[in-house]
From Swiss-Prot:
Gene3D superfamilies: 5' to 3' exonuclease, C-terminal subdomain, DNA-directed RNA polymerase, insert domain, RNA polymerase, RBP11-like subunit. Residues 240-312 are annotated as: Alpha C-terminal domain (alpha-CTD). This is DNA-directed RNA polymerase subunit alpha. The keyword Transmembrane helix does not apply. The gene is rpoA. The N-terminal domain is essential for RNAP assembly and basal transcription, whereas the C-terminal domain is involved in interaction with transcriptional regulators and with upstream promoter elements. Keywords: DNA-directed RNA polymerase, Nucleotidyltransferase, Transcription, Transferase.
Length: 312
């Protein structure tokens, strides 16, 4: 199999602390670049775990359409600013940050007090502007997750009235682009390909770590296919036909034949289906006339039994 390598050929950090990494992967066999690019892009955009603000509590506010005295931004603006925070939490459980400030002040993300397990990537992100003589008190909930989680309206009814839920975007990768170009033709005329990938993150993780995590997820996904084991299917027992469930009484046999069969522990048509004509004749006091009677009764419901027992 052709061995390829991956090189990071460019890395940039923007003012908002988002990071862009460009990677060159190759040489690859024809068609492999598309497979690799699509697989990595899908995992990078939707499969990586990240952190996000999931709820905000504002003192004195119980719905998102309110305004706060002495604060330039309304509640919706503050919620949007909190939602856009780039945060990296190493705690798998809920983290709660708090903010208690007095104006005049322009509140920024760095003013929010979290535990040491939470890192605010873009500390200069504006949150709110407070006028002199007014206060602002916030409680911000941060969780880890994967993908996008909309507000659960049913859960909202059971939570505190003043806890404002936010649609959470846990995706640390903001954008992935890739392009494919052909390289030198190999011996025998087979073309080679080279994959160029551009990965843009929100700064809570680096493009290098994002690529590595996506690759590890794909390895875990495909690893079981390398050790496929054949499982022998156990044939299912055929369900008995309705006729087999008919009790012996409904065959309308003579009293003699009925009593002989009962003594032989024959209680239904299903039991009779295990007998041959010869087996019937071996039942005590069961003559050919009784055996013929049983054969005729079974034929009336569409069942026949063999003339002689099957030799094993």
């Amino acid at each position: 199999m052709l061995q390829y390598q991956i090189d990071r050929i460019d890395h940039q950090t923007a003012n908002d602390r988002s990071q862009t990494g460009t990677f060159l992967i190759g040489p690859l066999e024809r068609g492999q670049a598309t497979t690799l690019g699509n697989s990595l892009r899908r995992v990078l955009m939707g499969g990586l775990e990240g952190s996000a603000v999931t709820a905000v509590r504002i003192a004195g506010i119980n719905h998102e359409y309110a305004t706060i005295p002495g604060v330039r931004e309304d509640v919706l603006d503050i919620l949007l600013n909190c939602k856009q925070l780039s945060i990296n939490s190493s705690n798998p459980e809920l983290e709660i940050g708090r903010l208690v400030v007095s104006g005049p002040m322009e509140v920024k993300a760095n003013d929010i007090q979290f535990s040491s397990q939470v890192e605010i990537v873009d500390g200069d992100k504006p949150i709110a502007t407070i006028q002199e003589g007014h206060n602002l008190e916030l409680e911000i909930h941060v969780e880890r997750g994967v993908g996008y989680r909309p507000v659960d309206r049913r859960n909202q009814e059971t939570t505190s009235v003043d806890l404002l839920q936010i649609d959470a975007v846990f995706m640390p990768v903001k954008r992935v682009n890739f392009s494919i170009d052909e390289t030198a033709v190999a011996e025998g005329g087979t073309g080679r390909e080279r994959l160029t990938m551009e990965v843009v993150t929100d700064g809570s993780t680096s493009p290098d770590d994002a690529i590595a995590e996506a690759a590890n997820q794909l390895i875990e996904l495909f690893q079981p296919l390398a050790t496929v084991t054949m499982v022998e299917e156990i044939p299912e027992e055929p369900e008995p036909s309705p006729e087999a469930q008919i009790p012996l009484e409904e065959l309308n046999l003579s009293v003699r034949a009925y009593n002989c069969l009962k003594r032989a522990q024959v209680n239904s048509v299903s039991d009779l289906m295990g007998f041959s004509y010869e087996d019937l004749l071996e039942i005590k006091n069961f003559g050919s006339k009784s055996a013929d009677e049983v054969i005729e009764a079974l034929e009336r419901i569409g069942i026949s039994i063999p003339q002689s027992r099957t030799s094993v």
